[in-house]
Amino acid sequence: MAKLHDTYRQTVVQELMNQFGYNSVMQVPRIEKITLNMGVGEALADKKVLENAAGDLAAISGQKPLITKARKSVAGFKIREGYPIGCKVTLRGERMWEFLERLICISMPRIRDFRGVSAKSFDGRGNYSMGVREQIIFPEIDYDKVDKVRGLDITITTTAKTDEEGRALLAAFSFPFRK
């Protein structure tokens, strides 16, 4: 079991109950899922690019990514409806906790000139989104085998009702917010 999951059960729940005055343990916000998304615009010209991106995402997440297709045609971008343009992975349960632990403890400190993540990236309902410019910050990616440095989007979906609750939940996991 992931260390962060134990921390959540033993200390974070109690802290948040005291801080927000919840009556029940079930009212305490929890992390529902983590979604990793990689948009690959170059996939239109070369299909291999999408395969490499999917391979990177599979290595980072530990599960096979879903290839996302264009929802509608856009002439300006030269894409048609149904074209494969990216890949995504939704992590839940044990894999989610393990990924979050690796993200906070290993990957974020490896970001160049890292001073913390913005505390303003909440969506109004307690969910947090962030972008990573380089996939090579993850230890699962071998720098020598990377064909191109790509970024990815990470969305942490919580059951929090407000941004304040979501921020408190992530801060309890020592999420590195910028001061």
Curated annotation (Swiss-Prot):
One of its GO terms (molecular function) is tRNA binding. Gene3D superfamilies: 3.30.1440.10. One of its GO terms (cellular component) is ribosome. It comes from the Bacteria. Keywords: Ribonucleoprotein, Ribosomal protein, RNA-binding, rRNA-binding, tRNA-binding. The keyword Isomerase does not apply. One of its GO terms (biological process) is translation. PANTHER family: 60S RIBOSOMAL PROTEIN L11-RELATED. NCBIfam families: PRK00010.1. This is one of the proteins that bind and probably mediate the attachment of the 5S RNA into the large ribosomal subunit, where it forms part of the central protuberance. In the 70S ribosome it contacts protein S13 of the 30S subunit (bridge B1b), connecting the 2 subunits; this bridge is implicated in subunit movement. Contacts the P site tRNA; the 5S rRNA and some of its associated proteins might help stabilize positioning of ribosome-bound tRNAs. HAMAP family: Ribosomal_uL5_B. Belongs to the universal ribosomal protein uL5 family. This is Large ribosomal subunit protein uL5. It comes from Tolumonas auensis (strain DSM 9187 / NBRC 110442 / TA 4). The gene is rplE.
